Amino acid sequence: MKFFALFIYRPVATILLSVAITLCGILGFRMLPVAPLPQVDFPVIMVSASLPGASPETMASSVATPLERSLGRIAGVSEMTSSSSLGSTRIILQFDFDRDINGAARDVQAAINAAQSLLPSGMPSRPTYRKANPSDAPIMILTLTSDTYSQGELYDFASTQLAPTISQIDGVGDVDVGGSSLPAVRVGLTPQALFNQGVSLDDVRTAISNANVRKPQGALEDGTHRWQIQTNDELKTAAEYQPLIIHYNNGGAVRLGDVATVTDSVQDVRNAGMTNAKPAILLMIRKLPEANIIQTVDSIRAKLPELQETIPAAIDLQIAQDRSPTIRASLEEVEQTLIISVALVILVVFLFLRSGRATIIPAVAVPVSLIGTFAAMYLCGFSLNNLSLMALTIATGFVVDDAIVVLENIARHLEAGMKPLQAALQGTREVGFTVLSMSLSLVPVFLPLLLMGGLPGRLLREFAVTLSVAIGISLLVSLTLTPMMCGWMLKASKPREQKRLRGFGRMLVALQQGYGKSLKWVLNHTRLVGVVLLGTIALNISIPKTFFPEQDTGVLMGGIQADQSISFQAMRGKLQDFMKIIRDDPAVDNVTGFTGGSRVNSGMMFITLKPRDERSETAQQIIDRLRVKLAKEPGANLFLMAVQDIRVGGRQSNASYQYTLLSDDLAALREWEPKIRKKLATLPELADVNSDQQDNGAEMNLVYDRDTMARLGIDVQAANSLLNNAFGQRQISTIYQPMNQYKVVMEVDPRYTQDISALEKMFVINNEGKAIPLSYFAKWQPANAPLSVNHQGLSAASTISFNLPTGKSLSDASAAIDRAMTQLGVPSTVRGSFAGTAQVFQETMNSQVILIIAAIATVYIVLGILYESYVHPLTILSTLPSAGVGALLALELFNAPFSLIALIGIMLLIGIVKKNAIMMVDFALEAQRHGNLTPQEAIFQACLLRFRPIMMTTLAALFGALPLVLSGGDGSELRQPLEITIVGGLVMSQLLTLYTTPVVYLFFDRLRLRFSRKPKQTVTE
């Protein structure tokens, strides 16, 4: 009592304490960063290596494998995957959460250095690494377009000036430039002209290489002067290469222009980028794993005016995609919902107490508790994100509960005629332990969440801590500020209510009287209620499950997968066709895409949807609509998926979820992967089934006749060099410019490589100087070859990706895949497992039951300690089954799967619904100890006296949650599962626990009496 009196009789100190809490919270709020979700990105590093012209199998065996063996020794690597395609290898390293990305980068560089001696000597550069996850959607896409500059020149501006500057911005992890390649001088050889002049391709390559040399020439000096020697040893443009003499034939000079077409072009002509049907260069910006997306985007936007000044005015620099607007809109929705929730909660208090003065008290207590929480969030390094703001919204119902219990009890004494200060002291003393029990038993609910490991633990930590801090501050405010304000603001009289509120008061009295009559009947018919309770507990609801609610971020990402033998020209046409279909959709605002590079038959598209208030469909509905139109395009597929704020793993795939097949036997993997993929494609629980295994690419297999080659004076190296010179876009020389270095690229003119007959026109100069046609010593035949070779760890791997059809959940898909694998009888040499988000879902499902049991056990222990009883905690926890059933029924009603967010709702219900039981049990025990009442009389009186605060706290929680349930703006799909579970659980538990709690209380009392052989007592009227 002295503790309460200290604050009641010292109002100035109490007010200043509350002001201090509020000011600290305001300061913390201003410094908190903004993010869509808590920081849960895995540290990911991507290693890239290239060997132009090398086949995927060559890249896998000679480049990927040595690097993997070295990189696999790094501590903290949780997953290592690689993909090798034509001339390129990419290795993705995913590290444990607690691994520092900078320390990991140093280890990666050391591993690359250690493997350098095992790599092919012909690699043009050392392997490089980037601290970014290539599977993440870019946080921003910039486009460069121009009516006067070529694509190569635009690419040069982007890669030389823009990308390095953007990479230096804090938070940027990687800037990927696509849509073309650097400028180059391209030499397109004419085979017949070379044959007529007796010039080999190696002669041309050597002549060009020797004619463009950058070497130091030294200096001259005399006694007084020094002269630097400079020569015209470099050729920089196509016009300068055109007259280059490469050979003499019968005394006549053969110039390069006589046997080739020389143009100023680009290094790789098999690249294309577009934005809204216009050729463009794309700058795809990804953030560092630990970076804040909003801060990074803001920094990039602030830099854009400066970047615009560094490029010519004829180049148009635009933002094609920015993920931050929907994030900001989502957070604004939650903030508005929080304000509405506070207003509704205060309205509930006003309706029940029907006093403006009394309503002011929780109207002050709630903001103080919530605002003060921001200070703790800042000290903990948290951010303002959807989950932390949802925690504060939910906390609105919790923090007002404490104030309501204290306020209502003090108001009851005032209505009985007690003086304000005495009523404040007496009322707070009576419910102080109750409020303490309610708060202390609520916080332990979140301990299991705090102890969770991996992604779910990281994701829920901010939510749990934020809510716990808000409850702690609320406990302090309810026992200090609330009784002080009651003692000094309220009067010792019945509240004078307005006429329009009298009807509500009469309704409340009638409701309480009706409850009292029904409760008397229930207490004399406990077996019937027991049957209802047991039936409720036994109800088992099968509900679909998923990892995280499918978000509508306003951004779609699409992967194009075409026939494996498609040409680049045809693939570029597919990109244009798909972009037109999507651009014509009324819900689409912007479309960008690119194709080419080492994967000729694939491409990527990024689609920005119109804001939510300008479209009526969700992202998934738009995907479903587009899927029908896109399926009509022959020879290629475009797989669309909505970009999510959480994406696990480093695999680049064409769908949201992955199932990986591993085998040490590559032949077995290639045999079984098509069977498994075709089976999964027939399952109704899956959509957009596709695979990264591409082993049916068209190949021309040349077989050398070595005996004939030896007889003709030709070696294998000369023959291979011929093929590389002719068809490999071989980089044969370097052009040095002040800002960058450019290449001279040689190949047979594409006009002469349109079909297989191009091989018949190739010839090799033998050791006698004679031109020997390739067909003299080689035979060729078409065959199939892999377009890519994939590894996970050191095993061959193939990843099957899939999306979920509308109405299906991840648990449905998971079970269907397991059944399909069993039905197919896949041998033990081929192992299947979920990857990425699907893998985390499996791990989370396995731990959910344990989490709920741990939360209940923790609450039981705390309640047992507080009440010094093994029995009373069971009475209080008997409210949980009905709440759980109500939550699951509500999810079924709204057709919402059980996700990680719904799990939070179940955990919260454990803390919410037991408050009603605590208020009943606490007053019943007090009445038995000090009022000499029988257990039946005590629990009956407790139920009646606590009916009003129980209704107030429950309705406050309901009204606090309703805005989130009913909100339909940005991010609503993330918030609604939490509120659906809470509202459903509260409604069900409120209907049942007002009756089941007193019945359970009496059941345990009778059990105690039976063991102590005391006579049974009956209800007294």
Swiss-Prot record:
GO terms for cellular component: plasma membrane. Part of a tripartite efflux system composed of MdtA, MdtB and MdtC. MdtC forms a heteromultimer with MdtB. The keyword Membrane applies. It holds the Pfam family ACR_tran. Keywords: Cell inner membrane, Cell membrane, Membrane, Transmembrane, Transmembrane helix, Transport. It is a multi-pass membrane protein. It comes from the Bacteria. It comes from Shigella flexneri serotype 5b (strain 8401). One of its GO terms (molecular function) is xenobiotic transmembrane transporter activity. Belongs to the resistance-nodulation-cell division (RND) (TC 2.A.6) family. MdtC subfamily. The chain crosses the membrane at residues 3-23, 333-353, 360-380, 387-407, 431-451, 463-483, 849-869, 893-913, 949-969, 980-1000. This is Multidrug resistance protein MdtC. Signal peptide: none annotated. Its main location: membrane.
